[in-house]
Amino acid sequence: SLFIFCENRIFKLTGSSTSDFSVVPVTRNIGCINGDTIQEFGGDLVFLGPDGLRTIAGTQNIGDTELGTISRNVQSIFDANIKDSSSFESVVIQDKTQYRIFFTKDSKAANTTRGIICVMKQDGFEFSEIRGIRPSCTDTVVQAGNVLVLHGDFSGFIHRQEKGNTFDG
């Protein structure tokens, strides 16, 4: 299936050819705030909705209730950052089962920028806050079995996360 994210709705394209393609609604009341937050994470799709981080499975199965939001434990951080962030970036680190989301505000210095690390555990999700990363883009690369977590900044530099404390590793 192909999911189609809109600002206020989510649809699913099903079928295998032009003769049986069909677009069906997943929800007509919740959408995705920013496409850069959509990531495959732990066998599901995670995205930033207006009420925090959501999974497609939770949104589909539960409907449009708050139960579909996985970030309830840290909702105050999302509430403080969703409204006035100028951009969002996210990255998944599969071998650590982590989803990281970064909130960028044009008026804030890089060292005050906040983000959230979401870790998938057997019994749910755990969260921690990260500060000081203001990425313009993010990615992971597997090189000789090693996972490199990278982000580009707004000055044009590429930084490596997970090594050292300056991101220059």
Located regions from the model:
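Beta-sheet-dominated scaffold domains
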Residues: 1-169
